[in-house]
Amino acid sequence: MSAEGSAKFHYYGIAQFEIEVIYSALKGVFGSVDELQLPIEDAQYVSMVEIEFPIPFGEFFFQIFSMERWYKIKGLLKEMKRRRGGRRGVKAFISFCGIAPEEIKPRLIFSVMNKNNRHFEMAIEKIEYLVDIIPVQMQIFPATNNMEEIVYHYDEVNFKWNPYRANYSDGSEYYYLPKTKELKRK
């Protein structure tokens, strides 16, 4: 089964077998993978993985990509983090070309930069459970028709994903403040 579009897989500091596992999971569904090894850009992390799926985040993604492939990628990311330890571990960016079923078009990015192994694992584990929550959370931001990107961060204190920042085509940025549940425009 081949889905439309090309998946993106950029990385640094990961082993050949890790590259092969992620690449084959993406290629098996999307057919084409934009793979790129980057120079180390952040000395705080020995490894970085960025995966961009060419379909929107939602139930349809998990049907097309399959839970088996999703579990394989999740398991690999968690194992990479465990092997590299907490101090200089792994950062991961998992992104989608929109949010389904509402046809929300901004790129959705899950940014996983937790230093603590357990929090990293919990963040990865909880992504699939956000399918019904994210469309509701999007309502806190101004109109999504000119929103280009929304970034989610994992909150280690409250053990949940929160919207962090939304970027708009006019250059404006909104930051969500989870403690006060307010938006701040930058």
Go through the PLM ranges and name each one.
Residues 55-72:
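Short hydrophobic alpha-helical membrane-entry/anchor segments
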